[in-house]
Amino acid sequence: MTQPLFLIGPRGCGKTTVGMALADSLNRRFVDTDQWLQSQLNMTVADIVEREEWAGFRARETAALEAVTAPSTVIATGGGIILTEFNRHFMQNNGIVVYLCAPVSVLVNRLQAAPEEDLRPTLTGKPLSEEVQEVLEERDALYREVAHIIIDATNEPSQVISEIRSALAQTINC
């Protein structure tokens, strides 16, 4: 199987952490769309949003998704990548989409534990727990709609990787 694997889910679900280790375990290349975009522009996500607003960032995010999609690649996407219909169809049609699902309490705890690792401009202007709740309520149905595989991301990364590998094996053997 050489299809790209797209990891989707909200901030703090473990897309980058799991993605790097998953790519290593599958002997694949790893790319994080946000990191790729930031390195191409030499700007942070916050800088891009400040300069181009969210619409400009979302357009660049789509271009990044297309640019990094390649066989034998694990791709960690930004949490809002599913907001654009083109991106949802693109991922579904060009690879296997894995939704790393976690409840609000877990996401908030992870984001508070390492706030500097995931600096993003606020989407709502609300406190973190309220924002995570609101954003997840808005996006969960889209994550589920686009996903080929849904994984409980509350476990340790090694367990999440094991579950993804098992699900991939079942998907391939259908």
UniProtKB/Swiss-Prot annotation:
Molecular function terms from GO: ATP binding; magnesium ion binding; shikimate kinase activity
Q: Which UniProt keywords apply?
A: Amino-acid biosynthesis, Aromatic amino acid biosynthesis, ATP-binding, Cytoplasm, Kinase, Magnesium, Metal-binding, Nucleotide-binding, Transferase
Q: What is its EC number?
A: 2.7.1.71
Region described as LID domain: spans on this chain: 112-126
Pathway assignment: Metabolic intermediate biosynthesis; chorismate biosynthesis; chorismate from D-erythrose 4-phosphate and phosphoenolpyruvate: step 5/7
Q: Which reaction does it catalyse?
A: shikimate + ATP = 3-phosphoshikimate + ADP + H(+)
Give the binding site residues for Mg(2+).
Answer: T16, D32
Any idea which positions bind ATP?
G12, C13, G14, K15, T16, T17, R120
Stated role: Catalyzes the specific phosphorylation of the 3-hydroxyl group of shikimic acid using ATP as a cosubstrate.
Q: Which family is annotated?
A: Belongs to the shikimate kinase family. AroL subfamily.
Subunit notes for this chain? Monomer.
From the Swiss-Prot or TrEMBL record, give the protein name. Answer: Shikimate kinase 2
- Gene name in the database record: aroL
